[in-house]
């Protein structure tokens, strides 16, 4: 079938959880289906990133759209104006009339069998009017977004920020409920998320697919050795749950660890670290902040303990599966391991207070047989159960079933149409490339 895949960014560099999940899923789906990847484009990606897109799609359509940069005057002005909007800011900033028009044009041309909206944000550009979108639709939910905002609100101590986060949480809850009910099918990435959407939003056609990991890519190379007391955290540092996690770890957990192991070090790997974290690394030589790296594996290999101190989040944590495949000893909060079929004390250690988390990290750093046993069991689990091929096959079946159900409800011809491959470039309009 011909799938129109909606996104808010190109996938290269494949450097954060949502990109990793989509990239691996699409690479597998592309072998069985025709993929048109329609995305917003902030102009940062170059020719190489666009060329790389054909690893996961047959046609690339880029719609120019640049959200405000964080911490600028324009950014704060948008936050202020958003107080009067029914949409949460995380959705509002991706509204694009041009993307909406491109969706309508392609669907009405009869060249699309099924549309997949990847994350909640692109849904703001899916037309609401009856007849504008006459193909089956699937919403791919990597998280329950409202739950993330609820947890932000719950851990925030600043009164002004807490009020703002409360409003964003309630807006997101309303919007997410509406969107989940609008689509023909919703796909979650864990059974917990599926159940929450069923129970909280009253969504009937919601399914779940497991999280996968590329076990050929993520495996120990033997070229790097763990530093005895090195603790590693990886993740995009411009994602709010990761920002909160590393602040929590450096302020409340790391000092407790260093009381027992004074030479313990922390390596934070991930793009766009905030100024406060960079300033900490300048003042404290035991903290290393790398920023974006081309290959996270060598940093993971050097970890004697891999930590996931998340207090906020939803969906599942790809970073845990990657660390498991790398045979790392992992310490996580319950929220950090949420949605993953793994057991405390078997594949990792769970701890939900600063004191217990610090104690668990100290155990791993001091007890090498324990660390090795956790890493060995973790790697065996992901290699046996969580390859991307199996995950993509399940997602593909959900799409096929959604299309088949739609065909029984309509007499419209939704068979795949033959297309003429073409390439055009227009500075003010979408850039279309096909292979």
Q: Which functions belong to the PLM regions below?
A:
Residues 348-355, 363-368:
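Conserved acidic donor-binding segment of nucleotide-sugar-dependent glycosyltransferases
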Residues 1-63, 108-110, 421-435:
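N-terminal subdomain of nucleotide-sugar transferases
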Residues 319-322, 329-333, 349:
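Short hydrophobic beta-strand element within catalytic cores of glycosyltransferases
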Residues 8, 74-92, 135-174, 236:
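Acceptor-binding helix/loop patch of EC 2.4 sugar-transfer enzymes
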Residues 62, 136, 146, 166-220:
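Donor nucleotide-sugar binding/catalytic pocket of nucleotide-sugar-dependent glycosyltransferases
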Residues 199, 203, 208-302:
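Conserved catalytic-core segment of nucleotide-activated headgroup transferases in glycan assembly
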Residues 184, 286, 292, 301-315, ...:
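Acidic donor-binding loop of glycosyltransferase active sites
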Residues 370-385, 394-397:
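A short, well-ordered alpha-helix in the C-terminal region of glycosyltransferases
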């Amino acid at each position: 079938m011909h799938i129109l895949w909606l996104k808010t960014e190109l996938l290269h560099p494949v450097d954060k959880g949502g990109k990793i999940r989509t990239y691996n899923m699409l690479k597998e789906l592309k072998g069985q289906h025709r993929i048109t990847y329609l995305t917003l484009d902030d102009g940062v990606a170059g020719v190489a990133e666009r060329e790389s897109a054909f690893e996961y799609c047959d046609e690339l359509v880029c719609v120019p759209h640049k959200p405000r940069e964080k911490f600028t005057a324009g950014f704060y002005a948008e936050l202020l104006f958003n107080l009067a909007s029914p949409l949460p800011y995380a959705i509002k900033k991706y509204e694009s009339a041009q993307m909406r028009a491109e969706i309508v044009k392609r669907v009405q041309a009869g060249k699309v069998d099924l549309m997949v909206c990847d994350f909640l944000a692109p849904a703001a550009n899916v037309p609401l009017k009856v007849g504008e979108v006459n193909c089956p639709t699937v919403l791919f939910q990597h998280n329950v977004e409202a739950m993330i905002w609820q947890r932000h609100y719950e851990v925030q101590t600043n009164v002004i920020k807490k009020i703002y986060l409360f409003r964003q949480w309630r807006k997101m809850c309303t919007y997410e409920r509406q969107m989940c009910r609008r689509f023909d099918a919703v796909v979650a990435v864990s059974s917990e998320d599926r159940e929450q959407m069923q129970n909280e939003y009253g969504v009937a056609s919601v399914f779940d697919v497991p999280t996968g990991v590329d076990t050929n890519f993520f495996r120990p190379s033997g070229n790097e050795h763990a530093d005895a007391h090195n603790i590693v955290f990886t993740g995009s540092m411009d994602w709010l749950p990761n920002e909160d996690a590393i602040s929590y770890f450096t302020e409340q957990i790391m000092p407790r660890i260093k009381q027992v192991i004074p030479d313990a070090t922390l390596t934070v790997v991930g793009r766009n670290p905030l100024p406060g974290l960079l300033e900490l690394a300048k003042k404290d030589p035991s903290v290393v902040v790398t920023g974006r790296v081309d290959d996270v594996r060598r940093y993971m290999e050097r970890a004697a303990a891999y930590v996931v101190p998340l207090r906020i989040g939803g969906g599942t944590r790809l970073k845990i599966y990657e660390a498991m495949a790398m045979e790392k000893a992992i310490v996580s909060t319950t929220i950090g391991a949420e949605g993953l079929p793994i057991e405390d004390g078997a594949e990792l250690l769970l701890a939900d207070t600063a004191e217990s988390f610090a104690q668990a990290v100290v155990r791993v750093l001091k007890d090498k047989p324990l660390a090795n046993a956790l890493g060995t069991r973790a790697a065996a689990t992901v290699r046996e159960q969580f390859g991307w091929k199996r995950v993509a096959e399940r997602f593909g079946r959900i799409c096929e079933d959604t299309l088949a159900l739609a065909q029984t409800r309509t007499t419209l011809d939704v068979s795949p149409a033959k297309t003429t491959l073409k390439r055009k470039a227009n500075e003010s309009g979408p850039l279309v490339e096909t292979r």
